[in-house]
């Protein structure tokens, strides 16, 4: 997910996106804990996407 795409979204859409990413992160962590996760790079990717969304939410709150 690109930051440019996220900047075009509203605060409500960003909050929805954040919830979806957190759910996905939880599911990936459960798969990793049970040894079922084949693509371990997804954990890092989702974690960074969560950080991007949170950063944009903070920027929009300050502006």
Curated annotation (Swiss-Prot):
Gene Ontology BP terms: cytoplasmic translation; ribosomal large subunit assembly
Domain of life: Bacteria
Keywords annotated in UniProt: Ribonucleoprotein, Ribosomal protein, RNA-binding, rRNA-binding
GO molecular function: rRNA binding; structural constituent of ribosome
Role description: Binds 23S rRNA. It is not essential for growth. One of the proteins that surrounds the polypeptide exit tunnel on the outside of the subunit. Contacts trigger factor.
UniProt record similarity statement: Belongs to the universal ribosomal protein uL29 family.
Protein source organism: Escherichia coli (strain K12)
Name of the protein in its database record: Large ribosomal subunit protein uL29
